[in-house]
């Protein structure tokens, strides 16, 4: 972070900036993985009572989560999920890697976060281009995998596992992705998932939402007084970093981000 803020992060060649070239030798400052690591590396050490419920409620547009002590809170990055059962898909699919997984146990809850920085939400995945009649974007894949991982699909198992509350959030420089609104409708969500009739129930609606980077910095600024002095120092550094990353995008594409 300090390297970038002090202008030592280097720059991208044009093919790399457009996403046409990937360099395996270095993680570029423009990588969304770098932003993910900085953002959630900081949030991990802040008191979750003062940021987690407000962040989720902002994403969902409703007061669904309350301030509380979070038992067994875990924030994990780039977590691989179980391979989705082949018999429930019309295409081959490998393991899904979720950018951020937040979980706690009172009540049992799992949050998937899909992070984006310099690229758009992918319209297709590696083995699914949508030709089988189902949407193939990253958001619906994460929704499908998350619902199964948290017990919302009916499966012919010897033992039934208890359901966990589930939330899926798209975190990008700007809000307004139409897929978020589309998949918030239960009927549309079911028709977008193979064997959607197995979804006999769904988490409390809405459970799919979105955040912008500015939502995050605004929330941390508003809640800053509730944190300890060391936490405030971390918040100030993170807010400066995210503002810097938004400025980089603005310079690259000629418009701002809200």
Model segments located where?
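Charged, terminal alpha-helix-loop-beta segments
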Residues: 1-258
């Amino acid at each position: 972070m300090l390297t970038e803020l002090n202008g030592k992060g280097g720059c991208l060649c044009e093919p790399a900036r457009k996403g046409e070239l990937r360099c395996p030798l270095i993680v570029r400052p423009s990588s969304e993985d770098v932003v993910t690591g900085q953002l959630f590396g900081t949030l991990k050490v802040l008191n979750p009572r003062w940021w987690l419920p407000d962040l989720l409620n902002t994403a969902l547009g409703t007061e669904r989560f309350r301030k509380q002590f979070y038992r067994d809170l875990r924030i994990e990055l780039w977590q691989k999920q179980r391979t989705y059962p082949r018999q429930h898909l019309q295409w081959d699919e490998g393991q899904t890697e979720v950018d951020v997984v937040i979980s706690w146990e009172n009540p049992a809850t799992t949050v998937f976060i899909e992070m984006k920085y310099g690229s758009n939400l992918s319209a297709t995945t590696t083995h699914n281009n949508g030709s089988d009649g189902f949407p193939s974007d990253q958001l619906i894949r994460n929704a499908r995998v998350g619902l199964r991982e948290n017990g919302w699909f009916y499966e012919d198992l010897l033992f039934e596992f208890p359901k966990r509350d589930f939330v899926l959030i798209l975190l990008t420089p700007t809000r307004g992705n139409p897929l978020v609104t589309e998949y918030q409708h239960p009927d549309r969500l079911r028709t977008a998932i193979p064997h959607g009739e197995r979804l006999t129930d769904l988490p409390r609606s809405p459970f799919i939402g979105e955040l912008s980077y500015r939502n995050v910095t605004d929330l941390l600024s508003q809640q800053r007084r509730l944190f300890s002095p060391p936490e405030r120092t971390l918040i100030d550094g993170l807010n400066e970093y995210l503002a810097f990353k938004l400025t980089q995008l603005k310079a690259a594409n000629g418009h701002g981000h809200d």
